[in-house]
């Protein structure tokens, strides 16, 4: 009887330690998340002619249409900080799942000599041009992906897109109404900013 009570006490102590340690891990994760929030919300006034940063913008995902397994959409970025900045080229995209894990992406910048697709918006099919954006101005880019799996490929569910405007720059986060499911190793066709 005494041995049974001792084993029961050890078991209850183990359960209590396990339960408390799980809560401590969750608390650490929450603290880590809130630490990154102030960094992404910092904005500064920029003199004219400097490169745009993701932190200068608010993003909106524009649901598109699909045809023959190819889904088309666009993203509108609105400059929310004072001053003006310049932008030229293609966005750098990162896809995340519902837990925030980064998903594989295989971007193809269009237009290119390698062919590819034509976006429904004619501006998206033009080469990159230099854009100067003041507070309240908008810029867009188009994207497309196949939602039809081939062979043994997986179609991941991306619920968040981080858009980086320049290499090493900050990002703006965009959340689509419906998850993106790019198949074929995360192949996403991307237009330049227009």
Question: Which sequence ranges carry the predicted segments?
Answer:
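Asparagine-centered strand-capping/turn motif at beta-strand->loop junctions
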Residues: 75-82
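The feature marks short-to-medium sequence segments in extracytoplasmic or secretory-pathway proteins
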Residues: 88-133
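Acidic, serine/threonine- and proline-rich intrinsically disordered appendage/tail regions
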Residues: 152, 171-194
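Short, surface-exposed ligand- or partner-binding patches at beta-edge/loop junctions that are enriched
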Residues: 139, 147-171
């Amino acid at each position: 009887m005494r041995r049974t009570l001792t084993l029961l006490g050890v078991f209850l102590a183990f359960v209590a330690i396990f339960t408390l340690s799980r809560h401590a891990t969750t608390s650490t994760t929450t603290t880590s998340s809130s630490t990154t929030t102030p960094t992404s919300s910092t904005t500064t006034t920029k003199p004219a002619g400097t490169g745009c940063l993701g932190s200068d913008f608010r993003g909106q995902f524009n649901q598109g249409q699909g045809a023959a397994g190819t889904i088309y959409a666009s993203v509108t970025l609105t400059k929310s900080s004072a001053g003006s900045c310049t932008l030229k080229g293609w966005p750098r995209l990162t896809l995340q799942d519902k837990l925030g894990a980064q998903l594989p992406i295989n971007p193809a910048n269009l237009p290119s000599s390698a062919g590819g697709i034509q976006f429904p918006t004619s501006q998206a099919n033009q080469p990159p041009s230099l854009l100067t954006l003041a507070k309240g101005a908008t810029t867009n880019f188009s994207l497309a992906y196949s939602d039809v799996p081939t062979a043994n490929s997986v179609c991941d569910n991306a619920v968040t897109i981080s858009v980086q405007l320049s290499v090493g720059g900050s990002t703006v986060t965009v959340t689509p109404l419906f998850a993106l499911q790019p198949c074929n190793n995360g192949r996403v066709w991307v237009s330049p900013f227009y």
